[in-house]
Amino acid sequence: RKLKRQNLNKSAPDEDKPFEGKSMAMIFEKPSTRTRMSFDIATKQLGGSSIILNPDGIHYGKGDETLKDTAKVLTEYVDIVMLRTSSHKNLEEFGKYLNIPIINGLSDVGHPCQIMSDILTYEESNGTIKGKTLAWLGDGNNNMSNSLIEAAGKFEFNLRIACPKKYSPNKKILSWVKKNKINLTITVKPDEAVKNSDCVMTDKWVSMNDKVNKEAKKKILKSFQVNKKLMSKANSDAIFMHCLPVGRGEEVTDEVIDGKQSVVWRQALNRVHAQKSIIKWCLD
C-alpha cells in the first residue's frame, strides 16, 4: 500500500479507499504529535474521516458521564475508536463496552502501534527481522520496552535490554517471557547489549506523567546513553531507532540521532502506513 502511494500527494486518498464512508473517534487523554497526526492522515488516506476528542471537551473527561455510557454512544456514532491513555485500565474498560474495534494508541502498559511502525522500518532498511538482534537501552520497564518484548515473540527476533536493575522488566512480563520462551537477555552493561546488534533503540528517560524524581532517574540512566562510541560496537549496517519525542543529549546524542545510521524520521512516517494496516485489519 505504501509503494502504491509513491506518485500521490501526501493528502491524496489511496485509490481503493477501503475506509470510505467510515469514521474513527480518537480520544487523547495524553498530549500527542505523531499519534494524532499519523492516525488522522491514515484515516484520510484510506478514504475515511476522523473525529478528535479531548477529555476536557467531552462529558467523560469532565467526570459527569461514565466511561460505559460514553463507549455505548461511540458505538452508535463511529466504526473504530483509538484511545491514547495514561491508564491501560481505561482501554480495557472501553473495550468491554464498545461493540466496535478499539486501538491502543498508547497506554502506560504498551505502545503496540509504534512497535509495528518500528518493525516495518527495520524490514524496509535491513530485510526480515526474524533472527536479528535488537538492543534496547534505558528504562526496561516502560510501555515501549513491554511492547518490544511482546514483538520479540511474535516476530522471532533476539532482544537484549540494557538497563539498571531498578528499571528491569517487571515480574509479570518476565513470567510471560519464560512461558513463551522469548529470546530475551537483560544486562546492566550497555556494551553487552549493543555488541554485534542489528538495531539499537532507546526512548525518552522520563515519560509523560511519570510520577518520579526526574533528575534522579536521569542520573541513574546516564550511563545508558546511546552515543557514537556505543553505536560503533553494533554491526556496521545497524540502524538507530527512537519513537520520539527525544531528549537530545540525554538518552541519545545529536551525533547519533542525526547521523547516517538513524532512521527515526522514516520511522515517524511509517506510523501512518503501519496504522493504515491496523485500521484495515480491524475492519476485515
Model feature map: region roles:
Residues R1-M37, I41, G110:
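Positively charged, low-complexity intrinsically disordered leader regions
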Residues S23-Y77:
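Active-site cofactor/substrate anionic-group-binding motifs, chiefly glycine-
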Residues E29-A42, E124-T202:
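Glycine-rich phosphate/diphosphate-binding loop of Rossmann-like nucleotide-binding domains
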Residues L46, Y77, Y97-L98, F155, ...:
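Short, structured coil segments at secondary-structure junctions
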Residues I51-L74, Y97, L148-E150, S168-I182:
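Active-site-proximal loop->helix
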Residues D79-A151, H242:
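Anion-binding alpha/beta catalytic cores of soluble intermediary-metabolism enzymes, centered on
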Residues K178-E255:
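Rossmann-like adenosine-cofactor binding region
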Residues D237-A238, C243-D284:
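Adenosine-phosphate binding glycine-rich loop
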